[in-house]
Amino acid sequence: LHDPLRRQRQMCIRDRVMIMLIGSSFWSWSIIFKKLLLFRTARSEASNFDQAFWSGEPLDELFEKLGPEPNGHTARVFSSGMVEWERSHRSDGVMIAGAQARIDRSMDVAVVREAEDLQSGLTILATIGSTAPFIGLFGTVWGIMNAFIEIAEQQSTNLAVVAPGIAEALLATGLGLLAAIPAVIFYNKLSADSDRIVAGYESFADEFSTILSRQLDS
């Protein structure tokens, strides 16, 4: 028998599945565009800072020019090292023992902090990429099940009876793939990009540590 309440429940579940998939797609694209812009800015800032750092300008002058809250990930790594460098000086100008180790640890912490900033949100892309196909599969099964229920109720296999349920099933499949495929592709790309950028920060920290080590030994 035809049950209007059952039909309403079916439509409610279908709508929730579709909303989840569409929302996941918009969420993933917002993260993708945000990260692409962030990575482009990070590369530009790193390039500009490298030019200033290797220009021959005294490090203390560069540090003062950057200020207490420098813009740019590499600049913040540099500032963290310089802050510890200045803290390690006694009033008579002599370096406190263990300065090199403290400077290295300070920059290591700064690199980790900048890496977390770059990589935040990427786990959401991974989650969407792995779960959206299964949510879409649930919608597919739900649509096919509704199509069979309609066949049983109408006692007919007419296309007009079967088509709505099949259309819902195909739409759920498509939306699941639409949400998952870009999320997976850009998760892999952005993860690789962030690894390369962070490797640049680590390389700079090592080079800067070497420079400070020479000054400590001189």
Where do the language-model regions lie?
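Alpha-helical transmembrane segments of multi-pass membrane proteins
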Residues: 30-41, 178-193
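Transmembrane alpha-helix/interfacial motif
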Residues: 14-57
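Hydrophobic alpha-helical transmembrane segments and adjacent short intramembrane/lumenal linkers
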Residues: 155-169
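Single conserved hydrophobic/aromatic residue that forms the stacking wall/gate
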Residues: 1-9, 13
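Predominantly long cytosolic amphipathic alpha-helical stalk/bundle segments
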Residues: 43-135, 146-158, 185-218
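N-terminal membrane-entry
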Residues: 14-18, 117-126, 168, 172
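Hydrophobic positions within alpha-helical transmembrane segments of bacterial inner-membrane proteins
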Residues: 130, 137-144, 173, 177-185
